[in-house]
């Protein structure tokens, strides 16, 4: 039978009688070893479950797994997959700037809900953005509260982050708070509009000293042809989100009131390069995701003082790889046919 136990949230003891095989078809479980950090994750996620763009926690069970006390978080099943995967699978169907705007409005709704509760998510990235189903009218939701923290008078100082989406103040001694989530929104917006991140590691590592320096300097650009047709309004929004000084970065309220977000139907339905870029670099993106997962547990703040490269001499490994492939493809198509002798 299932019995309630004493806890601030709805935690249940699972002692038998539950048909797990049937349950797994309808829910998405997550197992955590029972400790204060795990209970904090459950608490924040449970409190945020009222938002339509945050994955709902249905129940939490306490049990013994391999001799250790555990918490089983039962969440709604997100059958639509990850944000990037859905865009990759579009094939020849164009992904438009208007769609990118609508996606960012939904993500912003989740962040606004959290920030109104004084909760910083601190790990907003595409892998944590899931669709409820594969249907056309599916809903995008934010998940994974493993690094979430309540913001108080003391700003957040714990250096836990994912490299491609980490705010510059996390890489140095400065304190950081909700503005970290806003920085992540800027990076996700950037990727949605072109298919590659604004910051990168030239060494192939998940994060390198050079990548850290570029993040701290706000060193990025809008290269053609991927950005040639993207609206200036979208670029302006990204500039406000990627401000290196967190005090100058826009808040979530300002983000939601920005015309590119709150008037998404007026955003031009311009076809973007995003789906093609993500599809062409699909294998590389899988590698990047693996690097980011391992980096979460291993990265530490590094105060490398090596001279910063100028933007003109900085090499974007991801972009250069794509340019090389494009040149090779162009050379092949331009080569004359062979005549039989």
Language-model region placement:
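Short beta-strand micro-motifs within the conserved protein kinase catalytic domain, predominantly
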Residues: 56-69
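Activation segment signature within eukaryotic-like protein kinase domains
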Residues: 103-104
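Catalytic-loop of the protein kinase fold
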Residues: 115-132
């Amino acid at each position: 039978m299932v019995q309630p136990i004493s806890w601030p949230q709805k935690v249940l003891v699972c002692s038998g009688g539950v048909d797990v095989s049937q349950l797994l078809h309808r829910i998405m479980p997550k197992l955590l070893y029972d400790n204060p950090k795990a209970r904090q994750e459950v608490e924040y996620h449970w409190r945020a479950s009222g938002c339509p763009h945050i994955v709902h926690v249905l129940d939490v069970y306490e049990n013994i797994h391999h001799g250790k006390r555990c918490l089983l978080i039962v969440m709604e099943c997100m059958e639509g997959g990850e944000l990037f995967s859905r865009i990759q699978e579009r094939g020849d169907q164009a992904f438009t700037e208007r769609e990118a705007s609508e996606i960012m409005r939904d993500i912003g709704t989740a962040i606004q809900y959290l920030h109104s509760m004084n909760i910083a998510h601190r790990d907003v990235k595409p892998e944590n953005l899931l669709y409820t189903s594969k249907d056309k009218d599916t809903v995008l939701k934010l998940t994974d509260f493993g690094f979430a923290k309540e913001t108080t008078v003391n700003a957040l100082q714990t250096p836990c982050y994912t490299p491609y989406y980490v705010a510059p103040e996390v890489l140095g001694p400065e304190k950081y708070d909700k503005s970290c989530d806003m920085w992540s929104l800027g990076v996700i917006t950037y990727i949605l509009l072109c298919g590659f991140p604004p910051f990168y590691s030239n060494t192939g590592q998940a994060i390198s000293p050079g990548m850290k320096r570029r993040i701290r300097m706000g060193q990025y650009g809008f290269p053609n042809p991927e950005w040639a047709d993207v609206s200036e309004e979208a670029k302006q929004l990204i500039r406000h989100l990627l401000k290196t000084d967190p005090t100058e970065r826009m808040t979530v309220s300002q983000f939601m009131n920005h015309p590119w977000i709150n008037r998404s139907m007026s955003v031009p339905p311009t076809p973007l390069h995003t789906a093609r870029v993500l599809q062409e670099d699909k294998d590389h993106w899988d590698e990047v995701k693996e690097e980011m997962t391992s980096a979460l547990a291993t990265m530490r703040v590094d105060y490398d003082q090596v001279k910063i490269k100028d933007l003109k001499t900085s090499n974007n490994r991801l972009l250069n790889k794509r340019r090389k492939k494009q040149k090779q493809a162009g050379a092949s198509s331009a080569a004359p046919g062979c005549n039989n002798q």
